[in-house]
Design a protein with these regions (language model features):
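A detector for short, charged/polar N-terminal pre-domain segments
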Residues: 1-9
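Alpha-helical linker/hinge and terminal dimerization helices associated
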Residues: 17, 27, 64, 94-104
Length: 148
């Protein structure tokens, strides 16, 4: 992983995001948190990750304000990792990755998961960036500008 002190001066938002959640485990922890996982043991069983690596990634996500530790919701002595508002704001990132994967990484008819709107029971529509007038934007219609 890139040195966080070096990333502090990085002007690219994508590079800073990748520094925080770009490794396999951090992104999958966030995915599992959106799926309702909260306890260390549950993350470990789901991901099959070594305890020391999981501890490190959970700490990094807490230090960044993506997760917070709370007393267990069932009143037991356990503690739970819960997405903060900052963590919840990663939902579109997870959805975009999921949808890209659905479209590009599975053969026709191959079993995979879908994200469903609980209200309608329908698969959520494909996400795409849009211009102020509502037209879908492509990379060729955009440019990066540095701001202070």
């Amino acid at each position: 992983m890139a040195n966080s002190k070096l990333m502090k001066d990085e002007p690219c938002p994508v590079a800073r995001c990748v520094n925080l959640i770009g490794d396999r485990w951090s992104l999958l922890i966030v995915r599992d948190a959106f799926d309702g996982m909260r306890r260390f043991g549950d993350f470990q069983r789901s991901l099959g990750v070594a305890r020391n690596i999981l501890s490190d990634r959970l700490k990094k996500l807490m230090d960044a304000g993506v997760l917070e530790l709370q007393d267990a919701s069932d009143g037991t002595a356990f503690q739970e990792y819960v997405l903060t508002a900052k963590g919840e704001s990663l939902f579109p990132v997870i959805v975009a990755l999921r949808q890209w994967g659905e479209q590009n990484l599975f053969e026709n008819g191959e079993c995979h998961s879908l994200l469903i709107d609980k209200t309608t029971g329908q698969q959520i529509p494909f996400m795409a960036p849009v211009a102020a007038d509502g037209t879908v934007l492509r990379a060729s219609n955009t440019e990066v500008q540095k701001v202070k």
